[in-house]
Amino acid sequence: MKMILGRKIGMTRLFINDVSIPVTVVRAGPCYVVQKKNPQIDGYCAIQVGFEHLKRVNKPLEGHFKKAQVKPLRLLREIRLEDENELDSYEIGQEIKLDIFQPGEKVDITGWTKGRGFSGGIKRWGFSGGPRAHGSKFHRELGSLGQHTEPAKIFKGKKMPGRYGNERVTIHNLEVIKIDLENNLLVLKGSVPGARGSLVIIKSPRRTRK
């Protein structure tokens, strides 16, 4: 599996064949291989990659990076691999750049949506609310949530006010429009979850469209 970490820069548009296409610009990589995990010791195949250099680091992480002979990195994530043959193609300290992807390729993007705090049912779930009339006693309340005599309770899992946003979301099969290797920029068709500057994970698609 191909994967790289990045930061969302923002959205703009490109004109291709006189057609306006909304795109998202992501600054992705370079990432560095910090650790290799094999089935004999760890029980599975994976590599640990780091992203964004860090000035200050605690003692345990300092030893971890010193063993890999790479500079301290802010973010660490694992890439699961299928077998040891794929694991052998990576080396500790190896740099992973955007050249692993090509324009026209499909990718999956994982990000964290904007956190909107404690929100009511209308904003969080799109409830219609009550009548907007003078005689109405409620305008933005949830209304009837359960039954009266039987079962005389509200079932668990009912949509109610609560924390809205800040959830991990994956968008599948976004098309790579353009790649700028010199500036580590990736241009993707459509929108990507998260605020500007938030972490995103770009990886090869789990499922392909027929």
Curated annotation (Swiss-Prot):
BP-aspect Gene Ontology terms: translation
The answer on whether this UniProt entry bears the keyword Nucleotide-binding reads no
* SUPFAM superfamilies registered for this protein in UniProt: Translation proteins
Keywords, alphabetical: Ribonucleoprotein, Ribosomal protein, RNA-binding, rRNA-binding
The yes or no answer to whether the keyword rRNA-binding is present is: yes
Q: Identify the domain of life.
A: Bacteria
**What one GO molecular function would you report for this record?**
structural constituent of ribosome
Q: Which GO terms describe its cellular component?
A: cytosolic large ribosomal subunit
> What function does this protein fulfil?
One of the primary rRNA binding proteins, it binds directly near the 3'-end of the 23S rRNA, where it nucleates assembly of the 50S subunit.
Q: Which family does it belong to?
A: Belongs to the universal ribosomal protein uL3 family.
Record HAMAP family: Ribosomal_uL3_B (MF_01325_B)
User: What is known about its subunit structure?
Assistant: Part of the 50S ribosomal subunit. Forms a cluster with proteins L14 and L19.
Q: What name is this protein filed under?
A: Large ribosomal subunit protein uL3
Q: Identify the species of origin.
A: Pseudothermotoga lettingae (strain ATCC BAA-301 / DSM 14385 / NBRC 107922 / TMO) (Thermotoga lettingae)
The opening ranks of the lineage are: Bacteria, Thermotogati, Thermotogota, Thermotogae, Thermotogales
Gene name, per UniProt, is rplC
